[in-house]
């Protein structure tokens, strides 16, 4: 497998924790994209692709951090609440757990699929409990490309979660993917602007309905 040597470093987990405390927006042209319903989204142009990287900050009310992390990691449950999932499962490859994810795209666009690895760590930082999940695309021969489905080869996501001091969660998310194919960059960026807040709203509902909730 290629694309993620050593997968995730301690430093990557520390960086996600640090962003939760103090957003790292200086020194680059991060632009405020949208601010609504307690969620703030910034974007940064990735010059080679014409697409944007995104950073999301906010509070998800009514979702305790441990529950939110469990829901985010539970791929079987995601198939029930995420309407865009066509196929989603994990498989052991060379001693590493690898996820396969096919996403429904509206006609006439081709579906996209992802092959990625992810890791969760529950960290104690200055007496704060922080849950961090990192994910990134990899190349794995056990998942050959499918006819009619476009493989996303650039995908990276970070998620850091802690208590908001009440019954909800403070959240930081970093997100970038390049869906490839002949989709105008403006359409991809429009989808990201609308899709991220909608995904977070859906995740709040998923937390409230989680069957394994204690």
Where are the regions a protein language model picked out?
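Eukaryotic helix-grip
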Residues: 1-214
